[in-house]
């Protein structure tokens, strides 16, 4: 066990002092069953909240961060896949749903506890404390360079390593061979002496019954096969073809559009606005004087934008 830092010791005392009595009840554990209905389709098994495996051997990384040009969809998938020894050509990603189970305690823990190292016997309890807190806040954010250093290191890598351990154990139980004799390579588990092998997808039914390890062994830097390499970004093809969904593509029943013209100088107010000019324009529903800005609400964006441009506004 690593040497306790003063920060870790104080943090453990504060956090555990009031909640350790709850014990296992507040530990996050494997929440796969709680998100299966949100992310799994037919033929897919949710190994943990960060990944699912299909019978056709496709691995899907569930990414809880927004893509803003930083390549996080690919980077986090690489970290997960590397720990699994997965075939990168069979890895894809999906964005995590806006659900409480995806409130990211790894990010909260990273910002608050920093690099503090807690003893293993407290680790799961502390994770549970942070999970309880972030779920109450619906804490699912992107920022602060947190995606790789917190979610990647403390969620994706652990999720990948845990899934690999479960797959190896499933093969060991099925073939009646020591788990130490098994290796995983490119989404296939192999037993050299007997010549037996099976894809991750083939092992999924058995692996789903294996208990999830809370502290799976992570690779050393020398063992990385994907991390630290340059790989084609997973999000680019859909952006090129136009299939990718952006925030502005989202539509909900009864949705309307608004465009706003704000005062050109900080502190100035709307002096006058002639609503008669555009109120009869097709699709225009309402013109709102916000005091420091004017908004036009319409059935469509272009209708709102066109009407706003026609409005005579004096600030």
Descriptions of predicted regions:
Residues 1-315:
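Cofactor-binding beta-sheet edge motifs in enzyme active sites
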């Amino acid at each position: 066990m690593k040497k306790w830092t003063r920060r870790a010791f104080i943090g453990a005392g504060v956090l555990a002092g009031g909640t350790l009595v709850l014990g296992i009840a507040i530990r996050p554990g494997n929440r796969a069953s709680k998100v299966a209905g949100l992310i799994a389709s037919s033929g897919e098994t949710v190994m943990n909240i960060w990944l699912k495996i299909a019978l056709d051997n496709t691995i899907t990384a569930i990414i809880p961060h927004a893509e803003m040009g930083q390549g996080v969809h690919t980077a986090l998938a690489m970290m997960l896949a590397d720990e699994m020894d997965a075939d990168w050509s069979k890895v894809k990603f999906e964005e995590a749903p806006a659900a409480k189970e995806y409130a990211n305690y790894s990010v909260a823990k990273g910002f608050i506890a920093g690099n503090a190292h807690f003893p293993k016997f407290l680790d799961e309890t502390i994770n549970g404390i942070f999970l309880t807190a972030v779920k109450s806040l619906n804490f699912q954010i992107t920022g602060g360079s947190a995606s790789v250093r917190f979610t990647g290191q403390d969620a994706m890598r652990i999720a990948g390593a845990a899934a690999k351990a479960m797959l190896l154990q499933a093969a060991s139980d099925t073939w009646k061979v020591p788990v130490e004799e098994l290796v995983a390579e490119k989404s296939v588990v192999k037993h050299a002496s007997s010549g037996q092998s099976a894809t991750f997808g083939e092992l999924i039914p058995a692996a789903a019954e294996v208990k999830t390890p809370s502290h799976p062994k992570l690779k050393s830097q020398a063992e990385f096969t994907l991390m630290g390499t340059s790989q084609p970004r997973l999000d680019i093809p859909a952006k090129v073809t136009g299939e990718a969904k952006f925030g502005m593509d989202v539509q909900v029943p009864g949705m309307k559009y608004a465009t706003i013209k704000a005062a050109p100088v900080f502190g100035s107010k709307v002096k006058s606005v002639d609503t008669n000019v555009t109120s009869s324009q097709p699709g225009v529903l309402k013109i709102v004087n916000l005091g420091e800005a004017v908004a036009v609400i319409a059935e469509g964006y272009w209708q709102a934008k066109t009407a706003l441009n026609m409005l005579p506004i004096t600030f």
